[in-house]
Curated annotation (Swiss-Prot):
Protein name in UniProt: Aspartate--tRNA ligase, chloroplastic/mitochondrial
SUPFAM superfamilies noted in UniProt: Class II aaRS and biotin synthetases, GAD domain-like, Nucleic acid-binding proteins
GO molecular function: aspartate-tRNA ligase activity; ATP binding; DNA binding; metal ion binding
Annotated InterPro entries: Aa-tRNA-synt_II, aa-tRNA-synth_II, aa-tRNA-synth_II/BPL/LPL, Asp-tRNA-ligase_1, Asp-tRNA-ligase_1_N, Asp/Asn-tRNA-synth_IIb, AspRS_core, GAD-like_sf
DNA-binding interval(s): 91-176
PANTHER family given in the database record: ASPARTATE--TRNA LIGASE, MITOCHONDRIAL (PTHR22594:SF5), ASPARTYL/LYSYL-TRNA SYNTHETASE (PTHR22594)
Enzyme Commission number(s): 6.1.1.12
NCBIfam families referenced in this protein's UniProt entry, alphabetically: aspS_bact (TIGR00459), PRK00476.1 (NF001750)
Record field: catalytic activity: tRNA(Asp) + L-aspartate + ATP = L-aspartyl-tRNA(Asp) + AMP + diphosphate
Matching Pfam families: GAD, tRNA-synt_2, tRNA_anti-codon
Matches recorded under CDD domains: AspRS_core (cd00777), EcAspRS_like_N (cd04317)
Amino acid sequence: MSLLLRTLPLRPTRFLSATAISISNATNFFVVPKRTNPLPGTRRTFSSSPVAAASGDVVVKPVPSPPSVLRWVSRTELCGELSVNDVGKRVHLCGWVALHRVHGGLTFLNLRDHTGIVQVRTLPDEFPEAHGLINDMRLEYVVLVEGTVRSRPNESVNKKMKTGFVEVVAEHVEILNPVRTKLPFLVTTADENKDLIKEEIRLRFRCLDLRRQQMKNNIVLRHNVVKLIRRYLEDRHGFIEIETPILSRSTPEGARDYLVPSRIQSGTFYALPQSPQLFKQMLMVSGFDKYYQIARCFRDEDLRADRQPEFTQLDMEMAFMPMEDMLKLNEDLIRKVFSEIKGIQLPDPFPRLTYADAMDRYGSDRPDTRFDLELKDVSNVFTESSFRVFTEALESGGIIKVLCVPLGAKKYSNSALKKGDIYNEAMKSGAKGLPFLKVLDNGEIEGIAALVSSLDSAGKINFVKQCGAAPGDLILFGVGPVTSVNKTLDRLRLFVAHDMDLIDHSKHSILWVTDFPMFEWNEPEQRLEALHHPFTAPKPEDMDDLPSARALAYDMVYNGVEIGGGSLRIYKRDVQEKVLEIIGISPEEAESKFGYLLEALDMGAPPHGGIAYGLDRMVMMLGGASSIRDVIAFPKTTTAQCALTRTPSEVDPKQLQDLSIRTK
């Protein structure tokens, strides 16, 4: 019988006749003693004895107990932990029917619990009632199986299963809860067909989705990562875990806040925390030397594959710890996690790149260094060029950088470079075009005629040499403001690396990016804003020119993804007030929104710093998942909705009235 048919619910059944039917003529029936008024909680099951039904008994179809009867059963073993050491042992197992098949007059099912799967078989001659009930089961029924562990026949051994050398012969079976509706997808084959099952269906029926082996592995992996982190920080370094408030206050900078109206203080609002930043700084002022928290954070922002409106981060803060000690402690922690969880050995120490070097060489502050494709600045080649597009860009303060793609001349045709996927990738970054040149086998270059003709023979040789190009290579240009050029070439670099399979997936690229600028220019608002956050300390040597200062900030980047970021903090009030002033926060606004922080800095705040890791993102990368939604038990969709509970939702008008809220 097909797996699909096995998922269909049984039809409603009824009592048949008071006349006894022998087991030999009705192996699909079982017997319970006849009662006019069954006692509450009566166990509606059957005996494993092959004795025929006695006269006066009531014969019923093999259906579970009535809905009003709830049974709590115990088990002696777990399905995935049985082995040859258990042969001969009588066991009680509970779980879900993962597979059901009939072969040679015998019925087999795979019984699944959180530890794994074990095969259960029937012996119709010895235990006909158990055979009859199992024969009519459907996938995902919740059942109790009592039986004896036996070794599988040699021809039936399955070395791919952890329990593949044993099976359980069912002597007594009870259906604890049947499936009464058609399943939206098959759990058993869902891992193989994951790409065919729409994610909205998986999220809508998350309880089924989480039964899949891959999803279970992801959630267990997450648990193991958190358990290891807790053990390491507490036992090795003396950290203590402290919870910080969820109901906090809205602060400027960063993403939009989720607001919570106050009923008691009408017209006022709490904000859900985007991070525990200021609270953990308060803890350092309070004298708690080493703090950490597995913190829930909330940001009302546009979503991508690695973003959620509510997410979890590993949050840490330490007092009296210079930057070198801070980086070493975190390197040791991450090496421990990768080594114990995945067996990956990371370098000691981690490589470092300054922000300026990362942007110059890769066009990104989170570079993936598993492949080369470094960018080259060739502005000097075109300072006196006759190609006006380039010279005008330089005259307006822009730059010209190139990305040299080895053997890319044949990979990408001229038409692809003018209107294909690689061209579209450049357009997505905001570029107005994609200038390119190709190095021919004879060393000549071809491409945009006006660009080629702007270079004399010596200029061509110098240009090709400066690009590091060879015959057959493709040279892609980024022209314009520094930020725009880096954004375009970073995007093209990643596109080409994936498209040409240049990434060595056996390598693990982890590094620190340091020396970030303190501030960046916000063009729409025409003001400076903090690149990280306004509580980051500047480098001491840059204190005389704070608007241009570099920050004592550091980001940890793994395979091109930022997995953690932190900084040393400002711990003196006058410096903090100056930074807030630079980003446009007046003294009055600073006192209103950050008065408690400024007061604390005047009460003996120690030098301190910290870091936060995106736990969801870290587990996603350790587990090889494509989205953080696959490592969160109950995630939100890309439209910030919970498909399972259908939230957000409308609320009772009375609740809004109590909160003095009126909606449009």
